[in-house]
Design a protein with these regions (language model features):
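Generic marker of residues within folded, mature protein domains
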Residues: 5-8, 89, 113, 131, ...
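Short, solvent-exposed secondary-structure boundary motifs
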Residues: 293, 323-330
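C-terminal outer-membrane/trafficking sorting elements
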Residues: 327-408
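Intrinsic disorder/low-complexity segments
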Residues: 3-6, 250, 265, 382
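N-terminal compositionally biased, intrinsically disordered segments and leader/signal-like regions
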Residues: 5, 219, 228-235, 331, ...
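Divalent cation-coordinating acidic motifs and surrounding scaffolds
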Residues: 10-321
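Bacterial Sec-dependent N-terminal signal peptides
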Residues: 1-12, 322-326, 367
Length: 408
């Protein structure tokens, strides 16, 4: 397949999905966050999607690392616990979440897709472009963790989960840019759940951007896309057995292979830490058999000690022009009266011609706790009675506008 794009001003985005292995409750390896920090600092993703996140404290720790080591512009979506019925196992301690560079993406909304087991989490991101009002470009990022284990019963449970997603996506505009990242726990592209995702009759049809379809389980021909297990040694948590499965994926909608507004960068998809060495089959990634030129021993050590999965990475590109950062306009809006508030925050908008259609309130960890649509009125009374006491920042959706601080 040949993919070509015209030569315009281009912006590149780096994406990573990672199964965090019960973070932070899995403690067999001490100080695991240090190993994750090394991995994130090595790749420096613009969007970081995760599963097996146990709680909000783990999410906050990851956000702090991203802000300290990569960019203070990093934000996270609101952490939500699993809401699905969960009738087939106690998995309410395994959550999904997304982190993103707020100078490049604006979180427009987040939604939950319930299934019989675990939620799909849908995060609608908008490119922070100069023409985002007149011609917005949206990326729908969906993060998942399908039912694990082999056997026809588990295959059917995975299929039922994916069918719920298909139904949810049936209402999307057919030209939507959609990305599905997750631990699919599938053993072959012929498995019913995977076939459901790539069904050409669906409203949104997914593709494997690296085009490595096949029967992956214990098949050395696909060692380059294997993501589990990083380990053969027991006692570290998670699965052992060495590198012999492709469980982790980032799929894109078919239009992202060709559309110039937002598209997959050819040859950018990787199992991060996998040197595509056939000798690594069934070995742990620290083994000399797993050596190669792409990923050093130091990089592989960090991955080995943090999780039994390897992350999956890829890049997207756009031809739209992003807003230059930072060129702050501090007089665009202001807090009226004192910034010490109890129940109501009064805000005056001085300039609505700044590609802004919302205000966002963040806590000190950079998490969005409230969004406020902007109408025609220049004066807003914002109810903050539901917020906990503490320091907050309010910002226009246009990140060129300096955020304002208030205390509740």
């Amino acid at each position: 397949m040949m993919i070509t794009h015209s030569l315009f001003s281009q912006e590149n985005f780096k994406l990573m999905f990672y199964n965090l292995l019960n973070f932070p409750l899995e403690t067999n390896v001490p100080n695991r966050i240090d190993y994750l920090e090394q991995t994130l600092n090595t790749y420096k993703p613009d969007i970081f999607m995760v599963c097996e996140l146990n709680n909000v404290y783990g999410g906050n720790a990851i956000l702090q690392v991203l802000q300290d080591r990569i960019s203070e512009d990093y934000r996270s979506a609101v952490f939500t616990s699993n809401t699905s019925d969960d009738e087939i196992g106690n998995q309410n301690d395994l959550q999904n979440l997304i982190f993103y560079d707020n100078s490049k993406f604006i979180l427009e909304s987040q939604h939950i897709v319930q299934t019989l087991y675990r939620d799909f989490n849908h995060y609608k991101l908008k490119l922070n472009s100069v023409n985002q009002n007149s011609n917005p470009v949206y990326l729908n990022a969906i993060v998942c963790h399908l039912k694990a284990s082999s056997g026809s019963n588990n295959e059917n449970l995975r299929l039922q989960m994916v069918q719920d997603l298909t139904q949810y996506l049936s209402t999307f505009p057919s030209d939507s840019y959609v990305m599905l990242a997750g631990d699919f726990n599938v053993y072959s592209a012929s498995e019913p759940a995977f076939q459901e995702l790539i069904d050409p009759n669906n409203n949104i049809v997914f593709v494997d951007p690296v085009d490595r379809m096949g029967s992956w389980h214990t098949n050395v021909d696909y060692v380059d896309v294997f993501t589990q297990s990083t380990r053969t040694q027991t006692g570290l948590g998670g699965s052992t057995g060495g590198l012999d499965d492709r469980f982790d994926f980032i799929l894109t909608s078919t239009n992202m292979l060709s559309n110039q507004d937002l598209y997959y960068v050819p040859n950018s998809y990787q199992a991060f830490g996998n040197n595509s060495n056939p000798n690594c089959f069934n070995n742990e990634i620290l083994d000399t058999a797993c050596a190669g030129t792409s990923f050093s021993l130091e990089v592989r050590e960090a991955l080995y000690y943090f999780s039994d999965h390897l992350p999956v990475v890829m890049e997207l590109e756009t031809n739209v022009t992003l807003l230059s950062i930072p060129t702050y306009q501090t007089e665009s809006f202001q807090i009226m009266g004192t910034n010490m508030v109890d129940t109501t925050l009064e805000v005056q908008i001085h300039n609505q011609s700044l590609s802004s259609n919302k205000l966002y309130i963040f806590n000190t960890l950079g998490q969005v706790v409230k969004s406020i649509p902007l109408g025609t009125s220049n004066r807003l009374s914002i109810d903050v009675s539901g917020l906990k006491n503490g320091i907050y920042y309010i910002r226009m959706s246009n990140t060129n506008v300096q955020p304002l601080k208030f205390i509740k």
